[in-house]
Amino acid sequence: MSGVAIHASSWGAALVRISPYTFSAIGIAISIGVSVLGAAWGIYITGSSLIGAAIEAPRITSKNLISVIFCEAVAIYGVIVAIILQTKLESVPSSKMYDAESLRAGYAIFASGIIVGFANLVCGLCVGIIGSSCALSDAQNSTLFVKILVIEIFGSALGLFGVIVGIIMSAQATWPTK
């Protein structure tokens, strides 16, 4: 049993020795990278269905590009939050680098980046799948376009929820004063 406690404490000790700036940089990178991955995945899902359905019904091409724009907005959410998180970075003297306040600020920026990145990944997938359904159903019955577009707007709200939670989390990032 004592081996488990030593192993767990060594992980905690290892995490505390990592610079808070490293956690901050990883959080900012995850915010952008995973958000762009979600947007690209959504565009791929929507675009492939849109191209396939446009063969049968060419009229749907320009109308259903709104789904691609919703997917692009997901990447923009990640970039905006990454800029906000980057403005939270401040220089700290090396004597206060591993203080509790510095570690909390680094972890808060890291958590914000993870929350926003993965919320936008899920949002991109959701908007892509709904956009695909919108293109395929619009090719069959044009009266369904507006109804499914409303559902797509609700799907894109997932990304906005992630942005809001990320901004609230980043408010906890206060670095120690000099």
From Swiss-Prot:
GO terms for molecular function: proton-transporting ATPase activity, rotational mechanism. The keyword Cell cycle does not apply. It is found in: Endoplasmic reticulum membrane; Golgi apparatus membrane. The record marks E72 as: Essential for proton translocation. Residues 1-24, 86-108, 169-178 are lumenal. Residues 46-64, 130-147 are cytoplasmic. The chain crosses the membrane at residues 25-45, 65-85, 109-129, 148-168. Keywords: Endoplasmic reticulum, Golgi apparatus, Hydrogen ion transport, Ion transport, Membrane, Transmembrane, Transmembrane helix, Transport. GO terms for cellular component: endoplasmic reticulum membrane; Golgi membrane; proton-transporting V-type ATPase, V0 domain; vacuole. It is a multi-pass membrane protein. The keyword Nucleotide-binding does not apply. InterPro entries: ATPase_proteolipid_c-like_dom (IPR002379), ATPase_proteolipid_csu (IPR000245), F/V-ATP_Csub_sf (IPR035921). Proton-conducting pore forming subunit of the membrane integral V0 complex of vacuolar ATPase. V-ATPase is responsible for acidifying a variety of intracellular compartments in eukaryotic cells. V-ATPase is a heteromultimeric enzyme composed of a peripheral catalytic V1 complex (components A to H) attached to an integral membrane V0 proton pore complex (components: a, c, c'', d and e). The proteolipid components c and c'' are present as a hexameric ring that forms the proton-conducting pore. Interacts with APD2. Belongs to the V-ATPase proteolipid subunit family. This is V-type proton ATPase subunit c''2. It comes from Arabidopsis thaliana (Mouse-ear cress). The lineage of its organism: Eukaryota, Viridiplantae, Streptophyta, Embryophyta, Tracheophyta. The gene is VHA-c''2.
